Amino acid sequence: MRWTPLACRARPMLSFQHCGAKKTSIQEISIVTERVTLITGASAGIGTELARVFAANGHRLALTARRADRLEALANELAAKGGKKPIVIACDLEDADAGEKIAAALAAEGVELDHLVNNAGFGVFGDAIERDRVEQVGIVDVNVRALTDLSLRFADQLIRNKGGLLNVGSVAGYLPGPGMAVYYASKAYVISFTEALRAELAPHGVRVTVLCPGPVPTEFQARAGVGSGHDTALLNVPAAEVARQAYRGLMANKRAVLPGLGIKIVPFALRFFPRGFILSATSRFQRQRR
């Protein structure tokens, strides 16, 4: 999707000079007037609910996703509830320069991040060797490369503002995933990367949390091509509740948030089973979803 730059604000070129000192412009001082929370993948599902929760708790938002119309509708909804209208940045995180475009849009608005929520992600159902290779690499672009880029690109702002980073993983990241191999592997990366960043950012006062939900009834299921009706027992935590738990977990600086009792026990239970057994069980589960 073609990204349309936000209109840049004209900034006065005021300058200061004293006792022969070199002139310094306001632009060089780079005064930032407002802090915002950037949420990726905000146009649907958990991303939309996260936007609602953050806005309800007084955060000014910047929203990004591919679908500009949905972002605008959400921004108008949140503004109608009394908050300041979120900044809307329509772009596709599969594009290699998406991070640069987002950073430029935020700079043009004169804002800086105090929270970053890397929610965007997708998967496709079916054996990796049978699916389109470009499609599979696209999963890595969004779920891994873009998340890494934004986390590192804005780390200095999170440090400066003593903010927080919420990366959306999945309980799938604790498992091997035949039938959704690239997606499962991408979420394993998210968990490992986020836990490592947590240790690195802790001395700087930045909260870092990874959200690991199970299957949630959102548009993700349809896009992934997962058959309907097979996840009913696990679809017990609505997206809105997932978002509420994620927000509370981030504010409490929890290492990980796993919504739902059945999901919470997964990482613990896996310790007691051989890896081969887990692989076979996951493979059977995925075949049942066809």
Where are these regions (language model features)?
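Conserved glycine-rich cofactor-binding loop
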Residues: 43-44
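Conserved glycine-rich Rossmann-like NAD(P)H-binding loop of the short-chain dehydrogenase/reductase
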Residues: 57-74
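Conserved NAD(P)H cofactor-binding loop of Rossmann-fold oxidoreductase domains
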Residues: 119-124
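Substrate-binding pocket helix/loop in short-chain dehydrogenase/reductase
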Residues: 127-138
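Active-site helix of classical SDR
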Residues: 151, 186
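Residue(s) in the substrate-gating loop at a strand-loop-helix junction
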Residues: 170
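C-terminal helical subdomain
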Residues: 210, 230-266
